[in-house]
Structures are given as structure tokens and as C-alpha cells.
Amino acid sequence: MYPSRNKRGSYFNQRRQYSRNHVWKRPTAAKRHDWKRRPSNTSKPNDEPKMSAQRIHENQYGPEFVMAQNSAISSFISYPDLGRSEPNRSRSYIRLKQLRFKGTVKIEQVPLAMNMDGSTPKVEGVFSLVIVVDRKPHLGPSGCLHTFDELFGARIHSHGNLSVTPALKDRYYIRHVCKRVLSVEKDTLMVDVEGSIPLSNRRINCWATFKDVDRESCKGVYDNISKNALLVYYCWMSDTPAKASTFVSFDLDYIG
């Protein structure tokens, strides 16, 4: 019997009418079924470590990050190694969440640059820091990363909007450009650079994978990355002799 509802909102039970000659039969016993799921002992334990959110820090500075007039440098962001000590990764892939960078650029005039009257010339130039995603990382016959000119056509293009050359667009794409137009009247000038680049969001995830051929090669270096390496290109263009020294810290947030 199911309760019915009248117009006032109260409930009453409708009485079923049975004939007087109705013979009642004792209901037979029915098997009771337990539909609740019970834990199964046949499931195999998952020995694979759980992925966790981590952050890896890296500083790029030193003699190899000093640029002369109208020159460029190519570098890459190191990924975590496969291992137990953090920051690490537990599998042959990681999810890239966000890349932050912060640092300084020091512009120094070359002592040989001097006007006829003995005064120091004014330095005007453009400094660029470009983050590029390499979909299919591998080194060419030269054993080096693609140069700034090979990837963007020419260093002079840093004065305008940079774009990857048509021959390399299937492999590379620009993720972020930090540009500073500088005018230096003194011997030296310090400039701050800072940026934050989201690599994954709710709709799209950016995964990096590794070759990990053997135990000794399970590193986070460029040569061991098989998909989505992060490259950094520095470029310094000036009309008078001057050098640019960079000290930039990178923090990569990832799940691995």
C-alpha cells in the first residue's frame, strides 16, 4: 500500500477490498540477497608511487649567460630526475602547471666605446627573454639547441613581434615574451625582469614525457626529454657596444 496525498497535504492509506472467500497462502521463504559490494581480496596492490605537486628551482647565470652587443643565448629549463629525493618525479611523465621567473639584467658599456669629446655614448637597446615549448625535443647534427636566428629568422626581429619560422612551426611555439627597451646614460644599469606563465588549466593539460632508457639516464636534462621541453632564449640588441649579464631564477610547478 502506498500513501496518497489529499488536497490539504495530509496522508491517508487506501484500504484494499478483498472478497471474503479469499484464501490466504503462507508466503514461501525467499533467499536474501546482499547487494552491498564487499571488498575483494583478489585486487592487486598498486606498487606505482603516487604523483604529487612539487616545485623545482633553477638559477641561470654565469659567464655563459653574458651577451655581447647584438648576440643571443639559448638554454632550457631542467626537469626533475626520477628518484626518491624531492623535487623528483615518480613516473616517466609529469604535468607542467606553471613557470615563474624573476631576476635582473645588468647592462654595461664597453670601455672602448667613447665619443670624440671623451664622453661616454648613450646606449639604447632591446633585451628579450623568450619562453618556447619544444614539442619534439632532440638535438641536431651540431649537438646544440637551435639558435635564436634559426628559430626566429634573425636577431633584429626582437625589435618587433617574434614568430617562429615556418619550417619549425610544427615543432616549436612561443609561450611567453618578456621585452625591455632600455636607454642607458650611465656606465651600468640594472633592470628587473619577472613573469608568470600558466602551462596547464582546467581544460588543457601540458604533459612532459621522458625517454628513461636505463636507470642512469633517468634525468631531467634536455637530452632525456621526449615531449614538451621548455626552452629559454635571451637576446640583447644595442646600437653601441655594451654587454648584458643575466641572473634569472626559474620556479617550475608540476605534478609528478
From Swiss-Prot:
<dbReference type="GO" id="GO:0020002">
    <property type="term" value="C:host cell plasma membrane"/>
</dbReference>
<feature type="short sequence motif" description="Bipartite nuclear localization signal">
    <location>
        <begin position="21"/>
        <end position="42"/>
    </location>
</feature>
<keyword id="KW-1043">Host membrane</keyword>
<comment type="subunit">
    <text>Binds to single-stranded and double-stranded viral DNA. Interacts with the host nuclear shuttle interacting (NSI) protein. This interaction may allow NSP to recruit NSI monomers to the viral genome and thus regulate nuclear export of viral genome by NSP.</text>
</comment>
<dbReference type="GO" id="GO:0003697">
    <property type="term" value="F:single-stranded DNA binding"/>
</dbReference>
<dbReference type="GO" id="GO:0005198">
    <property type="term" value="F:structural molecule activity"/>
</dbReference>
<comment type="function">
    <text>Binds to the genomic viral ssDNA, shuttles it into and out of the cell nucleus. Begomoviruses use 2 proteins to transport their DNA from cell to cell. The nuclear shuttle protein (NSP) shuttles it between nucleus and cytoplasm and the movement protein (MP) probably transports the DNA-NSP complex to the cell periphery and facilitates movement across the cell wall.</text>
</comment>
<feature type="region of interest" description="Disordered">
    <location>
        <begin position="1"/>
        <end position="53"/>
    </location>
</feature>
<dbReference type="InterPro" id="IPR000263">
    <property type="entry name" value="GV_A/BR1_coat"/>
</dbReference>
<keyword id="KW-0813">Transport</keyword>
<feature type="region of interest" description="Interaction with Arabidopsis thaliana NSI protein">
    <location>
        <begin position="150"/>
        <end position="187"/>
    </location>
</feature>
<keyword id="KW-1048">Host nucleus</keyword>
<dbReference type="Pfam" id="PF00844">
    <property type="entry name" value="Gemini_coat"/>
</dbReference>
<keyword id="KW-0916">Viral movement protein</keyword>
<keyword id="KW-0238">DNA-binding</keyword>
<keyword id="KW-0945">Host-virus interaction</keyword>
<keyword id="KW-1035">Host cytoplasm</keyword>
<dbReference type="GO" id="GO:0016020">
    <property type="term" value="C:membrane"/>
</dbReference>
<feature type="short sequence motif" description="Nuclear localization signal">
    <location>
        <begin position="81"/>
        <end position="96"/>
    </location>
</feature>
<dbReference type="GO" id="GO:0030430">
    <property type="term" value="C:host cell cytoplasm"/>
</dbReference>
<keyword id="KW-0472">Membrane</keyword>
<dbReference type="GO" id="GO:0042025">
    <property type="term" value="C:host cell nucleus"/>
</dbReference>
<dbReference type="GO" id="GO:0046740">
    <property type="term" value="P:transport of virus in host, cell to cell"/>
</dbReference>
<feature type="compositionally biased region" description="Basic residues">
    <location>
        <begin position="17"/>
        <end position="39"/>
    </location>
</feature>
<dbReference type="GO" id="GO:0051027">
    <property type="term" value="P:DNA transport"/>
</dbReference>
<protein>
    <recommendedName>
        <fullName>Nuclear shuttle protein</fullName>
    </recommendedName>
</protein>
<dbReference type="GO" id="GO:0019028">
    <property type="term" value="C:viral capsid"/>
</dbReference>
<dbReference type="InterPro" id="IPR001530">
    <property type="entry name" value="Gemini_BR1"/>
</dbReference>
<keyword id="KW-1032">Host cell membrane</keyword>
<comment type="similarity">
    <text>Belongs to the begomovirus nuclear shuttle protein family.</text>
</comment>
<dbReference type="GO" id="GO:0043657">
    <property type="term" value="C:host cell"/>
</dbReference>
